[in-house]
Amino acid sequence: LLRELNQNILLPSCQQFVKDYLDTICHLYSDEEVWYRFSELTNAEANSLDGTKEYFDERHPLFGYRGIRRLLACPDEFQAETNVVTEVFQTNLNLSVIFPFVNDAEQLKQAITVLRQYDFTGKVGTMIELPSAYFDLDRILETGISKIIVGMNDLTSFVFATVRNSQWHDMESPIMLDMLRQMQDKARMKKIDFAVAGYLNTSFIQKMNQMGIECILH
């Protein structure tokens, strides 16, 4: 949404746009859960938005101040976005939120604490996009979350140290499928919803269907 507007969430016009959008979606799907992912911009994208006040100098687009890292580093932006979802939640109890680009359980707990301080009482979930989050999954599952979504494009990139569309970016490899099975089993034991998301091809989707894993397509 912020990319589409080319505006930082600090701007009132951006806040109103996101609020109206979420209100509309929550009303259209009033009988279903609606999951809103907090802003997940690369540093270059965030630096170029109208209204951005915090600028970070980074050379690699995939690393650094993305997702939850930027939220915690820029509390004004975090508060502004949280205020929007909290306001929408008051009249749309089917709204839930999910944190992207999470390092580990400790970082996730920090973000959830801030979220609760601003009176959001709905469900919370997390993306698993980093190997560090995969290795810390046991503790992540104890943070009170209700949903896990594995970001397949980023996780595969970081596991194989490659970029999407390269010959080494193979999300159907036995390594990635084993990781998914392990995460699925752990989430199931804790009764936490589990899904995968990304730019997914037909072959991968078929494998997920066979494993009983929900797919969210970009």
Where are these regions (language model features)?
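Conserved alpha/beta-domain cores
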Residues: L1-H218
